[in-house]
Amino acid sequence: GGGSTYTPELIDGFARLRDTLPVEELVLVDPAADRLELVGGLARRIFAKQGHPGTISWTGDLDAGVDGADAVLLQLRVGGQAARNQDETWPLECGCVGQETTGAGGLAKALRTVPVVLDIAERVRRRNPDAWIVDFTNPVGIVTRALLTAGHRAVGLCNVAIGFQRKFARLLGVAPGEVTLEHIGLNHLTWERAVRVGGEDVLPGLLAEHGEAIAEDLRMPRTLVDRLGVVPSYYLRYYYQHDAVVRELRTKPSRAAEVAAIERELLERYGDPALDEKPELLSRRGGAFYSEAAVDLTSSLLGDTGEVRIVNTLNGGTLPFLPDDAVIEVPAAVTAQGAKPLPVRPLEPLFAGLVANVTAYEHLALEAALKGGRERVFQALLSHPLIGQIAYAEKLTDDLIAHNREHLAWA
């Protein structure tokens, strides 16, 4: 995904944080040559402006691009924004949320993505068996589980946690590094159960003083946040307010259509030889702070630092009500051996039930992605808490296959 419009955000992070992660060589790999040329040119100008001594090159040859790599970062989108637009629209016909990582749309993305990612990972392993794979590719939980199940050296990463850390630090008037989160759940299904500064949980005071602003940012009622007593991730809105979200999505253009328009303008700007920094427009694309999270995680993996990062990794008994091979999103100590989750308090039943349900869905989704077949797709959809009815699951199965046939080898 080196030609992604996200890439300048990542490049800017590498340039600014070169003391944390001194990159000698960065290779952008993407099959889209035109985009790659635009993004690569801007990447070089960003490095040059900030005085970074590392080299940047780009190629459409995956094997050549990963040869000799210490770490490989994945941020790809199989089918592009056109496929995303489908993921966000056809589920609405059944009254189910249309979203690229949640529900039927999320399953469609997983089915398209997992085989491609596993092929890339196998080629990385053949070239560099010790290389780490850092996955940003959604749905991160399912993709990371696929990688780890296949024995790859992989860690999944999302920008939700670092986004909350930065937001809370700003509200509290402290440096981001002073804020630690008790972040728990699955990718795109998490809650902040504590916000600590100097070892003290300041979440109750944070909600008392800034609860209205936090709830508004989440687009959830203040009363819900107060009654939960935690800060849910933005994606919990699809569960706690499902029907309202469906009504809202039916009345406006899809997020994919909005992003596609932003991407067209971004690529036009990237081609300007005078541009030597990430444009402000990129902030509307999403993905804030993910470059910093990526730099921190990669530096811990390659530097064997043992620092705590919030990542997607194997459960391994951390949440005892989940299988050991489930992938959870929690704080973990990151070393050259990978990510080891820190011990956590038992998860409250109010949250644990949903986590268990979605974990079961993710298991079935991965089975469908690896083995194919209409019945496996149907079972995954039927198990999802946002679907759960046979009539919906049957129609969504047919629609998913019809819209994604070119990406499904078995269909």
What name fits each language-model region?
Residues V78, A82-A150:
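Rossmann-fold NAD(P)-binding glycine/threonine-rich loop
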Residues D19-I46:
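NAD(P)-binding Rossmann-fold cofactor-contacting core
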Residues P8, W132-D201:
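Rossmann-fold dinucleotide-binding core
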Residues R170-A411:
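Long, compositionally biased stretches enriched for glycine and/or charged residues
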Residues G2-P22, L26:
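N-terminal Rossmann-like dinucleotide-binding module
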Residues R18-L21, F47-P53, R126, L172-V174:
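Short helix-capping segments at alpha-helix termini
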Residues D67, L73-L74, D135:
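Redox-cofactor binding/interface segments in oxidoreductases and associated redox assembly factors
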Residues T55-G68:
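Short acidic low-complexity segments
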